[in-house]
C-alpha cells in the first residue's frame, strides 16, 4: 500500500463510554497534533493491530505531561479492570 495516498472509507458515529481523564488526555493529544479524536483512535488501533507502537518518544513525553496535568494515574495494568461508579453509570446501564 502506498503510504501517502488518501484512502476513502465509510465512517460511522458511535457512542462509547470511556474513563473521564483518559478522554481528556486523548482529546488534548489529538488537538496538539491537529487531529480529530476519531483519527487519533483509528491510528492507535491500526498500529496496535499491526503490533507497532503508535507513538514516538516525543509523543510519549507529551502524553506523560498530559496525564500529569489531568491527574490520570492509570496505566496499561488497569486495562479491563475499570468499573464505573454508580453515579457515572447511565440509568438502565449494564453492570459488567
Named regions from a protein language model:
Residues 33-60:
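Short, basic amphipathic alpha-helical segments that act as recognition/interaction helices
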Residues 1-20, 27-30, 67-77, 84-96:
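Short Lys/Arg-rich basic patches
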Residues 55-57, 64, 69:
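Short, charged, surface-exposed hinge/linker loops at domain edges
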Residues 17-23, 38-41:
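Extended hydrophobic secondary-structure segments
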